[in-house]
Regions:
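Alpha/propeptide regions of enzymes that mature by internal proteolysis
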Residues: 106-111
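IMPase-like, lithium-sensitive Mg2+-dependent phosphomonoesterase catalytic core
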Residues: 30-93, 100-102, 113-375
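Polybasic, lysine-enriched low-complexity intrinsically disordered terminal tails
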Residues: 1-38
């Protein structure tokens, strides 16, 4: 072949390769720009602090005084302190039992007492709080009267799942904020309100990261603690639970003590290839259910015929978050947040989670075709 033809033949693939390289370069630039744009969106979301979010929510109410915002901010401060102590619980030698029992007759874990003290001290200085109620205390604590500016009651479980600390399982703080009625003289009567009366609720999960879940009645929102700056940052606005997911969370060790309907439901899940996920820490189990979907159950048992979870500061705040995320919550006989409590430590059965999954439980365990759970 003549040299000219050989050169011509060689030039074609070289030209094509150059064209491909140029095209590939343009494509990479476009992809890089899109990726950077996506990263900017994520970073922008993550740079919304809890405090900024609270101020944003406050603007929904022209007459807001900022007092509720201060309470939520104070709870976030307590959460940071507790998160640090939970991470160092073994190093600081505060793991294990305190050697005493709480008002429920349950052995107190040392971190229960420490967490309770932290929250009481942080919230006790807020002039807008009239009453504090804790799982660890027999009676609600009166801080000030309504006539002295006490507009709110705060109820909380300082450290749910604390018995799991020695195995590094996720634990959490649960809280709810109620309005204080100055016309009601007794603290117990004041805090005994239906869950539907809650004005804010949330929980803090101390796990692989520290997560702060919050609702003020306008969606459920997720924040995560950035320890490098010491702030909770928004990672998910208006979280929505999946409508269904074949996952159930229940302590099957109590199966023989469940009412027949609940035993039938568990048998049904086995036949229908459901996955079982149960940690034994309510905050961790509900958080997984809220994020991934499924159903969390704590039925009545022979040992606890009225249920085991506390209505006012465990079931109600979790139900508020669940409903605001599009889920359902029931005691088995009615919507959880419609129950009128009679005492601070009142217990209740509980079923909550994805709407379709709660409906399955109600259909099998209670013979209800479809659970509307009307408000």
């Amino acid at each position: 072949m003549p040299a000219a033809k050989m050169n011509k033949a060689k030039s074609k693939p070289v030209k094509k390769r150059k064209t491909k390289l140029v095209a590939s370069g343009v494509s990479k630039v476009k992809k890089s720009a899109r990726a950077q744009s996506k990263r900017k969106d994520v970073v922008t979301d993550n740079l919304v602090s809890l405090q900024s979010f609270i101020i944003e929510e406050e603007q929904r109410y022209p007459s807001a005084t900022g007092e509720l915002s201060w309470i939520i901010s104070a709870i976030s401060l307590a959460a940071k302190i507790i998160a640090f102590k939970v991470r160092h619980v073994r190093l600081q030698g505060v793991i294990g039992q305190e050697g005493s029992t709480n008002v429920q007759g349950e052995a107190q874990i040392r971190m229960d007492v420490i967490s309770n003290e932290v929250i009481m001290r942080v919230l006790g200085s807020r002039p807008s709080i009239a009453v504090l109620g804790s799982e660890e205390d027999q009676e609600p604590t009166i801080l000030r009267k309504g006539s002295e500016g006490g507009k709110y009651c705060v109820l909380f479980d300082p450290l749910d799942g604390s018995s799991n600390l020695d195995t590094a399982v996720g634990v959490g703080t649960i809280f709810t904020v109620l309005k204080n009625d100055p016309n009601i003289p007794g603290a117990m009567e004041t805090v005994c309100q239906r869950g539907a009366e809650q004005i804010a609720a949330g929980y803090v999960l101390y796990g692989s990261s520290t997560v702060f879940m919050l609702t003020t009645g306008h969606g459920t929102h997720m924040f995560e603690l950035d320890t490098s700056v010491g702030s909770f940052l928004l990672v998910k606005r208006d979280l929505q639970i999946p409508a269904a997911n074949k996952v159930y969370s229940v302590n099957e060790a109590n199966l023989e003590g469940f009412p027949k309907g609940y035993r039938d439901y568990v048998a049904w899940t086995h036949r229908n290839n459901y996955s079982s996920r149960y940690i034994g820490s309510m905050v961790a189990d509900v958080h997984r259910t809220l994020v991934n979907g499924g159903v969390f159950l704590y039925p009545p048992t022979k040992k606890h015929p009225s249920g085991k979870l506390r209505l006012l500061y465990e079931a109600n705040p979790m139900s508020f978050l669940m409903e605001q995320a599009g889920g359902k919550s029931t005691t088995g006989s009615q919507r959880t947040m419609n129950v009128m409590p009679k005492q601070l430590h009142e217990r209740t059965p509980l079923v909550m989670g994805s709407p379709d999954e709660v409906d399955h439980v109600m259909r099998i365990a209670h013979g209800v075709k479809r659970s509307s759970l009307k408000r």
